[in-house]
Curated annotation (Swiss-Prot):
Database matches in Gene3D superfamilies: Jelly Rolls
GO CC, alphabetical: cytosol
Organism for this UniProt entry: Bos taurus
Any one of the GO BP annotations: taurine biosynthetic process
Protein name stated in the entry: Cysteine dioxygenase type 1
CDD domains, per database record: cupin_CDO
Length: 200
């Protein structure tokens, strides 16, 4: 059947083409998108042009704008880099490991009181694994806990967003954060000093 071929993108360009097909309609089939992203086997020769690292923080590098339906980006995590605890602004978030490992820690939404946030689970995501989260599942923090190996991950957000909330683990208090891109389509963007969710 033609459908099974669609689920096996052979290249990053092929994956992007299939994603455009999957997001052409109004409804999103989460399982299908996740299966397609997981089926793509990471090939550094295809994505290295987008993988722009920063010495001090993880970076967000835009790969494709998905006709306004989604943003596809590559995140580059140096040794020890991590995000804060954050939400996803009512968007679908798919994460696929391209290189290395990342630790994902899931948190419950904080209550109105000023209390330490409750950790729900944690896991290690390994090369070619895919994960999914949305705000109904909870909040998460993503970190490269290796001190010797960088990590690279492919993220799809639908619908795209440019602000989200970062949370203080000790109090549950949140701050609005404007998200920026370190590079777009393989070209470094100016003024990227703000707007990542790094741990402070």
């Amino acid at each position: 059947m033609e459908r099974t071929e669609v689920l096996k993108p052979r290249t990053l360009a092929d994956l992007i083409r299939v994603l455009h097909q999957l997001f052409a309609g109004e409804e999103i089939n989460v399982e299908e998108v996740q299966a397609v992203m997981e089926a793509y086997e990471s090939n550094p020769a295809e994505w290295a042009v987008y993988a722009k690292f920063d010495q001090y923080r993880y970076t967000r590098n835009l790969v494709d704008q998905g006709n306004g339906k989604f943003n596809l980006m590559i995140l580059c995590w140096g040794e020890g880099h991590g995000s804060s605890i954050h939400d996803h602004t009512d968007s679908h978030c798919f994460l696929k490991m391209l290189q290395g490992n990342l630790k994902e820690t899931l948190f419950a939404w904080p209550d109105k009181k000023s209390n330490e946030m409750i950790k729900k689970s944690e896991r290690i995501l390994r090369e070619n694994q895919c994960a999914y989260i949305n705000d109904s599942i909870g909040l998460h923090r993503v970190e490269n806990i290796s001190h010797t190996e960088p990590a690279v991950s492919l993220h799809l957000y639908s619908p795209p967003f440019d602000t989200c909330h970062a949370f203080d683990q000790r109090t549950g208090h949140k701050n609005k954060v404007i998200m920026t891109f370190h590079s777009k389509f393989g070209i470094k963007t100016p003024f990227t000093t703000s707007g990542s969710l790094e741990n402070n």
